[in-house]
Amino acid sequence: MNHQRVVVLGAGVTGKSAAEFLHKKGDFVIGIDGSWDALISCNFFHQRYLDKTENFPEDVDLFVRSPGIKTSHPLVIEAKRRDIPIVTDVQLAFQSPEFYQYPSLGITGSTGKTTTVLFLVHLLHSLGISAFAMGNIGFPILQAMYQKGVRVVEISSFQLTEQEQKIPVLSGAAILNISENHLDYHQTLHAYSEAKMNIAKCLQWPDSLWSGEGVSSGRSYLEYTEEIDSVLDKGGALKPLYLHDRNNYCAAYALAKEVTSVPLEAFLQAVQTFEKPPHRIEYLGEKDGVRYINDSKATTMSSVEKALMAVKENVIVIMGGRNKESNFTSLIPVLTQTVKHIVAMGECRKEIAQALSSSLPLTQARDLQEAVSIAQSIAQPGDVILLSPGCASFDQFRSFEERGDCFRQLVGDMEALKI
């Protein structure tokens, strides 16, 4: 076996999974991270360096970039200058013989990835097929790929950026949608879109690419809308569904059909028994005639727009956090149709105010706690208080999950909600 000297840049969850995978292959693994504590917490690094350009090792055969690290990072640029192949954990997995033992399905897109992945796994389970979610969903692909069953992989644009060569491994793939997102990382919408489209290079068959809103390539999974709507309507499951959820389920249906037959009755049962993950237009309850909805996962303008169109009217929306180079003015048309007041919070509250205060009533808040208090002081019976930030959470929280949990806790500090 030809053992390599491999740099792993980033010692987070994904980087550690890559280090373990490479170590077991017999490679010499060199870890680089800005935190020495993170480096020494991983036993699979043979050498460790702090994140400095002068620490770039000699005689490196392969460079593994953790997905959260930008391609503009000085060490990534240095690896390119030295003509060292650069990959992410997804490319490592897709090139591994272990990954070919079972069918695999890939899902990417700007919004809806996690819900679609989890529903697809749920649908396959309901059909008696073993299936596992992995990838960007929180289960590192290099660890989860050893499980026996269909691999349903959530893939982010960060993981697809380095996908330059064709690796025909996926039985089917879906690009759910493409809208402005992660411009702080990709710089342009074109570069972001190109990264998403790279999933097509991983398909065994070109006609197994399914696409949705804003995607020009592939077959539209919405071609199944009519038959799906018909069975959902008959089963009483259509009316309670938000449009974007129905579309996500359509995508899952199309992908499931790439590996098995899917009776519509079984699809209906899967929809009826599926529990959506939290923080995604999650209805928390009602008190004094005011409804509360947690959409902390909304970190893009398109996500906020979908939430507003789902809730439709009398909305007091809480927005803000760390800006991802988003254009807040793009929301003005939908905001003026649905929102009665904006509460702008956190690090970019002034940017939001500058963009939107001339179009709608707007109040600024330092943090989420103050934002909830302001929203409650404004709300009247029949209103909806919607947390749909349209921004990253990292100004105040470690994750969108922590932000959503905080919102739920702040709401829970009141009397018990009527669900």
Swiss-Prot record:
InterPro entries in the cross-refs:
Mur-like_cat_sf, Mur_ligase_C, Mur_ligase_C_dom_sf, Mur_ligase_cen, MurD
One of its GO biological process terms is: cell wall organization
The secretion signal range is none
Q: Where in the cell is it found?
A: Cytoplasm
Q: What is its EC number?
A: 6.3.2.9
Tell me if Cell wall biogenesis/degradation is a UniProt keyword of this record: yes
Question: Can you state which reaction this protein catalyses?
Answer: UDP-N-acetyl-alpha-D-muramoyl-L-alanine + D-glutamate + ATP = UDP-N-acetyl-alpha-D-muramoyl-L-alanyl-D-glutamate + ADP + phosphate + H(+)
Q: Does the keyword ATP-binding apply?
A: yes
Task: Please give the chief subcellular localization of this protein.
Answer: cytoplasm
Q: In which pathway does it act?
A: Cell wall biogenesis; peptidoglycan biosynthesis
Q: Which Pfam families match?
A: Mur_ligase_C, Mur_ligase_M
Q: Name one GO cellular component term.
A: cytoplasm
UniProt binding sites for ATP: G109, S110, T111, G112, K113, T114, T115
Keyword annotations from UniProtKB, A to Z: ATP-binding, Cell cycle, Cell division, Cell shape, Cell wall biogenesis/degradation, Cytoplasm, Ligase, Nucleotide-binding, Peptidoglycan synthesis
MF GO annotations: ATP binding; UDP-N-acetylmuramoylalanine-D-glutamate ligase activity
Q: Which family does it belong to?
A: Belongs to the MurCDEF family.
- Free-text function comment from the UniProt entry: Cell wall formation. Catalyzes the addition of glutamate to the nucleotide precursor UDP-N-acetylmuramoyl-L-alanine (UMA).
Cited NCBIfam families: murD (TIGR01087)
The name under which this protein is listed is UDP-N-acetylmuramoylalanine--D-glutamate ligase
Q: Which organism is it from?
A: Chlamydia felis (strain Fe/C-56)
Q: What is the lineage of its organism?
A: Bacteria, Pseudomonadati, Chlamydiota, Chlamydiia, Chlamydiales
